């Protein structure tokens, strides 16, 4: 009986610690996205490329091929006027899906959805990004 009460008393602390771990992972993932976007804005291709996961680097094996892909296919991500974080979902241990609301270089609104995966060293890397025009109104 005492064990059951002890376990019951620990349950709220365990749940709270899991929530904080999720918050820490989300913050780490957002920091990666923010850092990559800042690198794009600063024209620092090597820094931007460093946030790409191995699966992305396998497809785009050099900084130049990666930057060409981003420049030609993701102009709002490459040169945003502004951006802010939207909805986020932790889809599994070490897996994050993060919405980023972007005002592109053309002044139009876009939604980028990033996927990130925690690596064996504990860091988060960007495994993918989908981009679409948004129907929201920027402020």
Identify the meaning behind each predicted range.
Residues 23-31, 35, 45-94:
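Short solvent-exposed beta->alpha transition segments
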Residues 7-17:
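Bacterial N-terminal signal peptides
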Residues 1-2:
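N-terminal secretory signal peptides that target proteins for export/translocation
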């Amino acid at each position: 009986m005492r064990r059951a009460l002890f376990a019951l008393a620990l349950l709220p602390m365990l749940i709270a610690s899991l929530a904080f771990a999720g918050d820490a992972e989300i913050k780490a993932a957002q920091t990666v996205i923010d850092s990559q976007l800042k690198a794009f804005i600063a024209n620092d291709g090597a820094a931007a490329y460093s946030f790409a996961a191995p699966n992305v680097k396998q497809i785009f094996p050099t900084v130049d091929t990666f930057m060409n892909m981003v420049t030609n296919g993701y102009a709002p991500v490459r040169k945003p006027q502004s951006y802010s974080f939207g909805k986020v979902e932790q889809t599994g241990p070490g897996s994050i899906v993060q919405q980023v609301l972007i005002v592109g270089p053309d002044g139009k609104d876009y939604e980028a959805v990033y996927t990130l995966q925690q690596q064996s060293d504990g860091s988060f890397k960007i495994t993918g990004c989908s981009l679409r025009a948004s129907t929201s109104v920027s402020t």
